[in-house]
Each structure stands twice: as C-alpha cells, then as structure tokens.
A protein has these predicted regions:
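Metal-dependent phosphodiesterase/phospholipase catalytic core, i.e.
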Residues: 1-108, 112-122, 143-144, 150, ...
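C-terminal active-site rim and adjoining tail of enzyme catalytic domains
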Residues: 121-212
Length: 212
C-alpha cells in the first residue's frame, strides 16, 4: 500500500486553535471532558509552580520523558537524539527544578548521551514488557541509572530485589486496573506511573482526588 507522507507540522499559534479536551474517549471512558488546548511544556510547569506557591502546597516532582527513536527518518522527520536531548536539557535547566525532576526514556542512546553530557539530571530507564533478562537490558546502558521504570507485567519480587541491589528505585508503568495497582503496592515499589491516580489514591490513602 502506497502511503503519502503529509507535513502536519504547525506553529503553536495554530495548535492553540484546537480544543483537545472536550471530546469523549472510547479508550478512556472515565476521562473528564474539559475544554482545553495543548499547553507548551514551559507554560505547564510555570502554571503548576505558581499554583503550588499560591496555595501553600508541597513542591511538585516532575517525571518528563525524552521521546526519541532510533528509526528511519531520524534527522529528517524529527531531530537526532543528541540534538533533541540537548534542546530538552537547555529548556529543563531554565526551569531550575533541581532534584524534583526525573528524566525518563526508552532510548538507551538518549540516556547514555544525557548521562555523559548532562550528569546533573536524575535519569530513569524505561523498559517494555519484551525487554528480556535484567542483565541483558541493563547492559545496553553505560551506567546505572537512579531509576528503573519497567512495564508492570514484568515487575515482580525478583526484579524489585535486583533494583535494590543495584541501588536503583523501581517505578513501574502503567498499571491501571485496581488489582494491578494493588500488586505493585504490595511489592513495595518506590512510585507508580498510572493513568488513574484516583484509583491509586484510594488504595494507598483511602480516598480519591476530587473531580475537576
């Protein structure tokens, strides 16, 4: 099947014209439908920081993903991983988040480059359900990251123990069902990435956050 590649890149002034929050989702039927636009990362962080300060809340921690990919089109349809990492780090430095920021990625090239060029950042290694043996996927890195973030389906007592032995925190993604969230909590993981933080709050604290 012949496919036509369309250039859909738009300036942010055009992106702002589109409501991306009002339409219900078949995939996420419990999603709150709120009229909104896609924010710039800088605007989002500024909003959160100002809100927390105004309300006298505890500082927020950020987990931001570097989405680079070793595939045909890199350097043409999207930036090379090293250029992209450098631009992201320049931006992140400007926000002065310190140890409240963790940068995660599946791309071992990006993680290795970032560790070498920007060692001040806390890094998290994302691995999927088909990552294979612990020693094999860890060998792809030239260093031991502060965090390991495996798919929840491969997260078990043995993996938690290996992370402890390596001095890494373990932060599985993305359990959404209550029973999967409960299993992660029972394993004693350090944090959990989920699309349903309200369900996690109900398990860990006995209450859910109010609806927006």
């Amino acid at each position: 099947l012949d496919m036509v590649m369309l250039d859909i890149r738009m300036p942010y002034s055009e992106v702002l014209k589109y409501d991306v929050g009002s339409r219900p989702s078949e995939v996420w039927p419990e999603k709150a439908c709120v009229k909104t636009v896609k924010p710039l990362a800088s605007d989002l962080i500024d909003f959160v920081e100002n809100y927390v300060k105004e309300k006298g809340l505890s500082p927020v921690r950020y987990n931001i993903e570097i989405k680079s990919k070793d595939a045909k089109g890199e350097g043409q349809n999207w930036p090379t991983y090293d250029r992209f990492v450098s631009e992201c780090c320049k931006f992140l430095h400007s926000k002065h988040l310190g140890d409240r920021l963790v940068v995660q990625s599946f791309d071992v090239r990006a993680l290795n480059y970032m560790h070498e060029k920007y060692p001040e950042f806390i890094l998290s290694y994302l691995v999927d359900a088909k990552a294979g043996e612990f020693d094999a996927f860890m060998a792809k890195l030239k260093f031991t990251p502060q965090w390991l973030s495996p798919h929840f389906s491969i997260t078990d007592e043995a993996l938690v123990q290996k992370c402890r032995e390596k001095g890494m925190k373990i932060v599985p993604w993305t359990p959404d069902k209550p029973e999967d969230l409960q299993r992660m909590v029972d394993l004693g993981v350090d944090a959990i990435i989920t699309n349903y933080p309200d369900r996690l709050l109900m398990i860990t604290r006995g209450y859910a956050a109010p609806a927006p």
